[in-house]
């Protein structure tokens, strides 16, 4: 049995298979995941698990060079935005942050290698993690 890092075998596999610039979408409980997309639905209750706790564990294993957020998060959910940016910055201070309109975010997410649905129940609690390289 694995002791540390991502213990969910499907998420662990998704991260292990990512290459440079591949994307992984970590989304809230209401996000429209495309039919046929590879997904892990972690929701057990409203708010559980939260976006930040899921991202925190994934960052232990995934090298991230950029995150993509919906620009609507700036007005509708600045608390989560700030906590997320701080969390990602602790792991890598050079991470780029890109804001796009929510409709564009949904289009971009369709090219993700996978989706992880959290129990996040705050508006626009979604992030796309863009994989970096370790060399």
Curated annotation (Swiss-Prot):
Enzyme Commission code(s) on record: 5.4.99.62
GO MF annotation, one: monosaccharide binding
Pathway per the UniProt entry: Carbohydrate metabolism; D-ribose degradation; D-ribose 5-phosphate from beta-D-ribopyranose: step 1/2
Keyword Heme: no
Compartmental location: Cytoplasm
Swiss-Prot/TrEMBL keywords: Carbohydrate metabolism, Cytoplasm, Isomerase
Recorded GO CC terms: cytosol
Top-rank EC class of the record's enzyme: isomerase
Active site: 20 (proton donor)
Catalysed reactions, as listed in the record: beta-D-ribopyranose = beta-D-ribofuranose
Reported function: Catalyzes the interconversion of beta-pyran and beta-furan forms of D-ribose.
Family recorded in the similarity comment: Belongs to the RbsD / FucU family. RbsD subfamily.
Subunit structure and binding partners: Homodecamer.
NCBIfam families reported for this sequence: PRK11797.1 (NF008761)
Name of this protein: D-ribose pyranase
Organism of derivation: Thermotoga petrophila (strain ATCC BAA-488 / DSM 13995 / JCM 10881 / RKU-1)
């Amino acid at each position: 049995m694995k002791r540390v890092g991502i213990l969910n075998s499907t998420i662990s596999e998704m991260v292990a298979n990512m290459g440079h610039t591949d994307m992984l979408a970590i989304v809230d409980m209401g996000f429209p995941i495309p039919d046929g997309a590879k997904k892990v639905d972690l929701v057990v209750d409203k708010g559980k698990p939260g976006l930040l706790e899921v991202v925190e564990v994934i960052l232990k294993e995934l090298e991230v060079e950029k995150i993509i957020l919906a620009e609507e998060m700036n007005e509708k959910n600045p608390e989560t935005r700030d906590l997320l940016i701080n969390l990602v910055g602790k792991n890598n201070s050079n991470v780029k942050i890109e804001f796009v309109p929510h409709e564009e975010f949904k289009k971009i997410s369709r090219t993700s290698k996978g989706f992880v649905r959290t129990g996040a129940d705050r508006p626009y609690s979604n992030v796309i993690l863009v994989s970096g390289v370790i060399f």
